[in-house]
Amino acid sequence: MLRTTRLWTTRMPTVSKLFLRNSSGNALNKNKLPFLYSSQGPQAVRYTSQHEWIAVHQDKTAFVGITKYATDALGDATYVELPEVGTEIAQGESLGSIESVKSASEIYQPADGTVEEINTNLEENPGVVNEDPMGDGWLVKMKLGEGVNVEQVEGLMSLEQYEKTLVHDD
């Protein structure tokens, strides 16, 4: 029995690879505002190679945040800087930044749009980004730019595509 156990454990993937393959951590939290904003849930959820996510609803309202993978790499958030409501931000431009005990990281806009609301809860409690990055830790609510179709925006990935990039990064 002991020998069988040893053989079994040597075949197990590392913890990080096992987590990435099972990866419910990078999926949108279905019990929180970014999902519940509309009764049907988001029309599309997409990810960037810089570890941001965007959840787009039927009315072209979108929520933007960072992934669980990003928060794990960043460490405990101590400060979140976000743009003012009404700010127009083009895809790839800085949306703000998150400072942590380890470093500071820029957050980039996944698609053209105008900021409609910021998550003011993060001003007093930036750790929510770590606790629930795919739900209560959303950063901004925005209106997509005219003619933007998130499914056709270059560089955005499905959850499956995004997680494949994470496995290759390790």
Curated annotation (Swiss-Prot):
One of its GO terms (biological process) is one-carbon metabolic process. Residues 61-143 form the Lipoyl-binding domain. The keyword Mitochondrion applies. GO terms for molecular function: lipoic acid binding. Induction: Induced by glycine and repressed by the C1 metabolic end products. The keyword Mitochondrion applies. Its main location: mitochondrion. HAMAP family: GcvH (MF_00272). Belongs to the GcvH family. The glycine cleavage system (glycine decarboxylase complex) catalyzes the degradation of glycine. The H protein shuttles the methylamine group of glycine from the P protein to the T protein. Component of the glycine decarboxylase complex (GDC), which is composed of four proteins: P, T, L and H. This is Glycine cleavage system H protein, mitochondrial. It comes from Saccharomyces cerevisiae (strain ATCC 204508 / S288c).
